[in-house]
Amino acid sequence: MSEEDTSKLRILSVGSNAISAFISWRLSESKACHTTLIWRNRCESVLSEGIRIRSSVFGSTKWKPDVVAPTVEQLAMNSEPFDYIFVCLKILPSVYNLDTAIKEVVTPGHTCIVLNTTGIVGAEKELQHAFPNNPVLSFVLPDQFAQRGPLQFEHTTFAADSAKSVIYVGLTEEEDDVPDSVQDAMIETLTLTLEAGGVSCDFLSKIQKKQWETGVGHMCFYPLSIINDEPNLALMYRLKSFAKVIDGLMDEAFSIAQAQGCEFEPEKLDVLKRHIVNRMLATPRPSYPYQDYIAHRPLEVAVLLGYPVEIAKELGVSVPRMETLLALFDAKNKRNLTVRAGTPQSSPNFNPAMRRSPVGAASRSPSRSTIGISNRIGSVDDLLNTRQFTSSPIGGSMPKGPNSIYKIPSASMVNLSSPLVTSPSGLNPTGRPSRFGGRVRGNPLTMNKAGSVSDLLSTSTNMASSDALETASMIGVPSAMPPNSFDMLTLTQRRNRRNNQSSSPPAPSDRRYTMGARRPVQTRGMTDSVIPILEDPMSTLYDTSRYPTRNSKPATPKASRPPSIASTVHRRMD
C-alpha cells in the first residue's frame, strides 16, 4: 500500500445492495477514503466492470471500488485496521447474528461501526452489547433506490431540494465505555468526509425520530401486503377496511415513538401521516420484502414488527394491532419457508383443471397468456383466485366486493377457445368456467377491442343461443353441427368465407381460413351456416365500387367525400 493510501480513511462497506454501493461511491469521490466493498455475488464483475449508478443528483457513472471481496473472512488477515465499517445487511436474528457477520474485521477501540437503520427501529442494541468499546452510529438515508439490472442501480432523492442528497447520522443512546472526545471526533470526521463527497450530512443527537418517520410506513404496509398476497399497496389501501387497519397501526407506532421521547407536533402529525401514505403508495412494486416472500427467502419479521413491539412492552404501551399483525406475519414467514423454492402457492379455492382449454384448442391458458399484459391484474394470485376463474356454485353467483376492480371482467381474460355455457347452472359438463356474457363496452358497430367474435355478436338481439359445439370447426369435430353453430373466425375471415362460398375449397397448404393455423374439417353435402356480419354503416361513404375496372363500366357512385376547399377554389378560378 502506498503512502497516499495509508493517509486515507479505510472504509469497509458490508452489503450487496444499492445503499452500500452508493455510500462507498460518494466516500470514494471525496478523495480521502480507501474503499473496500463486500459483494457476495458477481464479485469479479464488480472489480472488472464496476457498478453502474444513475443518480438524479450526481448523474450517471460507472464506479469501481479499490478492493472487492465476496466475504468478510477474506479481509480478516489484513494488517491495516478499518476506520469505519458501514453495515448495510438484512437484519435476520433467526438466521444469523449481526455482530458475528463483522466480528473478524472490527478492531476494538478503533473501528467505528455505522449501521443502516433506514426504516428500522431498535436494531443497534445487538451491536452495542457485542462491541462495547467501539462507537456505534446509525444513519438514515431517505432517498429511493431501485435496481435496474445486474450491477445497475438508480438513485432518486426525496429531499426538499432535489439538487442534493441528505443523510442523517446520529446516536440512539450514549455509550459509557466510549469517551465522548473519541465519539465526537469520529462523528465530525465522518460528517466532513460525506460533505466532501457531495452528500449533505446532518448529525442528530437523537436519531430515533428519523427512524420512526421512515419506518412507520414499512411496518404498516409491508406485513399486510405479504399476509394478503397483494403487492399493489395502492389497491390494498383503496379498500376502506384496510385503510382503517393501516391508520390504526400508524397511531400505535407514533404512540411508541412519543413514549420513547420523540416529539411530534399534534397539528403536523396528520400531515406527516399523509406524507408517509403517499410515499408508500409511490414506491415501486413489488417491494423488496415481497420479492423475498416470492423467492421463499427469510423475511425481516424482527425489523418490521418485532423490535417495535419489544420497545412497546418495555415502555408499557398497548399495541394490540401490532401484536396481532406480528403473530400473523411470523406464521406466514414460517409457512413460506417450508414451501420448496420455485413451487407456486395455489389459492385454496383454485382448481388447476379450470386452466385447461378444451381438447385440441389452439389458444393458450389465460393465466399464462395475460401475465404482464393486462393492467387489471393486481398480482399473480389475483389472476388465479376465485374472482377470475372459480366457477360459481349452482344457482348462485360469484360475490364481488364494492371496491373490487374486477366488477367488469375484461375480454382479454377470456380463453378464446373455451365454449360458451348457456346451461342454467352456468357450468358445462366438464366444470369449466363460463365466459363473461354481460355487456360489452363500446359501440358494437365499431368495436375493435373485442375478445372474440362471440363477444361482438352477443350484442345482436337476433342472436341464437350457442352451445358447446360452436368451436367444432376449430377443434376438429366433424359434421354434426346444428344450424345455429358457427366457427370462431375473425370478421375478415367471415367476410372472405361468405364471398367465396361458391368457390372451390382452399388448398391443404392454405392456412388463411383458420384461427389456429388449422384447416376446417371439410364436410360433404352440408355447408356450415354463416351468421350475418354486422357491417359498418360508414363504409358506404368510401365504397370503391364507383371506380372503373378493366372489364366493366364504372358504377354509379353511391356517396363520396365532400370536395375540399382547395378543389373548390381551383374550379372557381378556372
From Swiss-Prot:
Phosphoserine modification sites are 392
User: Which Gene3D superfamilies does the record cross-reference, listed alphabetically?
Assistant: N-(1-d-carboxylethyl)-l-norvaline Dehydrogenase, domain 2, NAD(P)-binding Rossmann-like Domain
Q: Which UniProt keywords apply?
A: Cytoplasm, Meiosis, Phosphoprotein
Composition-biased stretches (Polar residues)? 364-374, 541-554
Entry-linked Pfam families: ApbA (PF02558), ApbA_C (PF08546)
Keyword Cytoplasm attributed: yes
| Protein name listed in UniProt | Meiotically up-regulated gene 72 protein
